[in-house]
Amino acid sequence: MVKKAHVTTSVNGDEYEYLCEPGQTLVDVLRNELELTGTKEGCSTGDCGACSVMLEGELVCSCLVLAVETDGKSVETIEGMAKGDDLHPLQRNFLELNGLQCGICTPGVLIAAKALLERNPNPTETETRFWLAGNLCRCTGYDKIVRSVMAAAEEMRGA
């Protein structure tokens, strides 16, 4: 019998302690142990980006990260994006410009877009498309998503 690992991690600024199997993925723990179901599991192979989260400030596919790897580290998920009732500019622009439809890819796209804008507050359309290439959307295509990110970037710059 495999011994469970004790993990302490910060998720969206809140401290969590849990036990997990050594091979259990971060997306599984987020959804099933911590009940943070905004992060979606689409492919389990890192190809779709639906499970994108920030780990220690780096964009990762949480289906490829073992939960034990987050011990002592910080994780940011879609649940931490809004501040109370105030939506993040990306969330607001996605709603206003119809940058989402079914919602499966949306949390991962929003996390990836936030990571982009934290690194490059004034991306070109080409840079935005390149950055989001790891996030698959089968509903909208990408034009409305890219327009939403570009509008949020402009808003965040105060332009």
Describe every region a protein language model picked out.
Residues M1-A159:
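Signature of N-terminal electron-transfer/Fe-S-associated modules in redox systems
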